[in-house]
Curated annotation (Swiss-Prot):
<dbReference type="InterPro" id="IPR002625">
    <property type="entry name" value="Smr_dom"/>
</dbReference>
<dbReference type="Pfam" id="PF08590">
    <property type="entry name" value="DUF1771"/>
</dbReference>
<dbReference type="Pfam" id="PF24767">
    <property type="entry name" value="UBA_At5g58720"/>
</dbReference>
<dbReference type="InterPro" id="IPR013899">
    <property type="entry name" value="DUF1771"/>
</dbReference>
<feature type="region of interest" description="Disordered">
    <location>
        <begin position="92"/>
        <end position="128"/>
    </location>
</feature>
<feature type="region of interest" description="Disordered">
    <location>
        <begin position="1"/>
        <end position="47"/>
    </location>
</feature>
<dbReference type="InterPro" id="IPR055319">
    <property type="entry name" value="At5g58720-like"/>
</dbReference>
<feature type="compositionally biased region" description="Basic residues">
    <location>
        <begin position="1"/>
        <end position="15"/>
    </location>
</feature>
<feature type="compositionally biased region" description="Basic and acidic residues">
    <location>
        <begin position="28"/>
        <end position="47"/>
    </location>
</feature>
<feature type="domain" description="Smr">
    <location>
        <begin position="428"/>
        <end position="502"/>
    </location>
</feature>
<dbReference type="InterPro" id="IPR056254">
    <property type="entry name" value="At5g58720/SDE5-like_UBA-like"/>
</dbReference>
<dbReference type="InterPro" id="IPR036063">
    <property type="entry name" value="Smr_dom_sf"/>
</dbReference>
<protein>
    <recommendedName>
        <fullName>SMR domain-containing protein At5g58720</fullName>
    </recommendedName>
</protein>
<feature type="compositionally biased region" description="Low complexity">
    <location>
        <begin position="98"/>
        <end position="127"/>
    </location>
</feature>
<comment type="subunit">
    <text>Interacts with PRL1.</text>
</comment>
Length: 519
């Protein structure tokens, strides 16, 4: 009986220890197993997704390594687009040694790197980046990148700094004209239009026209006013660059053209308002020799230097003189008095008070007419009326030639008024010369005196001859030439002649002969 009772008790205990089908202990174990299974599957799924993302990044960016792709993926917090932006910056800035390094990894890595290198200061910078080169769905986002001593995590540059774009506020129209080929063609047409209005006789080269147009922001009206002031010789300050109104602030000297908007090469200095346009004229590729700005005092020396310019090879030098060519040279270098010799003198030629303004009044009025035509032509050109602009441009060129002639007349009248009462005598000594070279020198000085109105008298020393009785061969030849040409003269003494010059160019008979004798 005892054994049966003990067996029953053991059986009861074992039954009590076994949980029922709906007991709590059995249900808890099942939940734990299920959660562990789900966690394992989730981790494997995350690992597979991350692995796929990393492989996609490596395929898109062939130059990055797996470590770099993983670091960028972790830094982006699992965001594929952000990771792609980081790697794109990494690839673009990889060849630039001046950029910063990528700082990726956890805060523990940053702390370890800081403690390893000492002063590990890091600053954060944000920049809006848009990357659609590899991923079409990427939108504009803000990327936070840390810079500092943690560059050892990924030893490559990551960010290329955007250059500060400073542009001339005055060059907004220049940016529009230089942007593409069509606008560049319009710019060249504007340059050709301005150059055609100035005419072939203008001393301003195409380089100066192009430079002025560029500095005026490709404003045709403004550039035309500047070019007219430069080409007009009636304004004393026309070549100083101070009256043109191209005032540029000092801040422009520190900024530069945007390389995408203008290809103009500026060749003036930092102080743009003080530009010396006279130097630009003289240093251009196709300079013209001016005739109105020649100094009267240095004119004789210039004429003589031009006439007696020795050739490099004397073997082929002609033994005769082309006096017609000599006269042409004097006309090109000196003041051609023939233009006004047949005209009536200006009524105010001998006015002493305020004579300059009185004599310049006609020339200034003519220049104002020229400017009016040119300004109307520029306005018509800007509005697209090319035909009307061409018509007004032709009218302006005609008025410009009239203004130049008025300038020349005014210059001659002023010279006569200022030099009235001044008696200039040029003395030459032909004593000891042979007849032929002596006559050559005399003809040269006769031409010289006829084209230079400031010389009124020519004193010629001929000598009295070997016998001393006034029978010098040189004197006889000189007298014979003067009588044939109809030039007035008188004897100062037996060995000196005073020749009276009329102060105006005249046609000598020896101009068409190549003989240097008295015949």
């Amino acid at each position: 009986m005892k054994q049966k009772n003990q067996h029953k008790k053991k059986k009861k205990r074992s039954c009590a220890a076994k949980p029922s089908g709906d007991g709590t202990t059995s249900d808890g174990n099942k939940k734990d197993v299920e959660e562990e299974r789900k966690d394992g599957e989730g981790k494997r799924e995350i690992e597979n997704v991350g692995k796929n993302f990393i492989e996609s990044l490596m395929e898109a960016f062939c130059s990055v390594s797996m470590e770099e792709a993983m670091a960028a993926y972790k830094e982006a917090g699992g965001d594929l687009n952000k990771a792609a932006e980081i790697l794109s910056d990494l690839v673009e800035s990889g060849d630039d040694p001046s950029t910063s390094s990528v700082a990726s990894g956890s805060s523990g890595q940053e702390t370890a790197s800081t403690s390893e290198y000492g002063a590990g200061s890091s600053s954060s910078c944000s920049e809006d980046l848009t990357r659609d080169r590899w991923f079409k769905g990427s939108k504009q986002s803000r990327v936070i990148a840390a810079t500092g001593m943690v560059s050892s995590v990924i030893a490559k540059d990551y960010l290329k700094p955007n250059p500060v774009r400073k542009e001339f506020p005055m060059m907004e129209r220049s940016k529009e004209l230089c942007g593409n080929g069509k606008k560049a063609a319009d710019r060249e047409k504007a340059e050709q239009f301005l150059s055609s209005m100035l005419g072939d006789d203008c001393e301003l080269s195409m380089a100066v026209v192009r430079d002025v147009l560029c500095q005026c922001g490709y404003d045709v009206d403004m550039a035309l006013n500047v070019l007219l002031d430069m080409s007009s010789s009636s304004t004393d300050d026309s070549l100083s660059g101070k009256c043109f109104g191209i005032g540029v602030s000092d801040s422009l000297a520190e900024s530069s053209f945007d390389t995408d908007t203008s290809d103009c090469e500026l060749f003036w200095g930092g102080d743009y308002s003080q530009r010396d346009y006279a130097k630009a004229l003289m240093s251009s590729q196709d300079p013209f020799a001016t005739t109105q700005g020649i100094d009267e005092l240095g004119l004789p020396q210039k004429v003589l230097e031009s006439l007696f310019n020795i050739r490099q090879n004397p073997k082929h030098e002609s033994k005769t003189t082309s006096w017609r060519n000599v006269a042409k040279k004097m006309q090109s270098l000196g003041i051609d008095a023939s233009s006004s010799s047949g005209e009536e003198p200006h009524p105010n030629t001998f006015v002493k008070d305020d004579s300059y303004h009185e004599l310049r009044k006609g020339a200034n009025d003519q220049w104002n007419v020229t400017k009016s035509y040119y300004q109307k032509a520029a306005e018509a050109y800007s509005k697209g009326g090319r035909a009307h602009a061409a018509y007004l441009s032709d009218k302006g060129r005609v008025a410009s030639k009239q203004a130049q002639r008025a300038d020349e007349r005014a210059s001659q009248d002023i010279f006569v008024a200022r030099n009235k009462g001044i008696e200039n005598v040029v003395t030459i000594d032909l004593h000891g010369q042979h007849v032929k070279p002596a006559m050559k020198l005399l003809k040269l000085h006769l031409l010289f005196g006829s084209y230079v109105p400031s010389i009124q008298t020519l004193r010629v020393i001929t000598g009295c001859g070997a016998s001393g009785f006034g029978k010098s061969k040189v004197k006889q030849s000189v007298v014979k030439l003067l009588e044939r040409e109809g030039v007035r003269y008188c004897e100062e003494n037996r060995g000196t002649l005073l020749i009276k010059l009329d102060g105006g160019s005249r046609e000598f008979s020896f101009l068409d002969t190549e003989s240097d004798s008295d015949e």
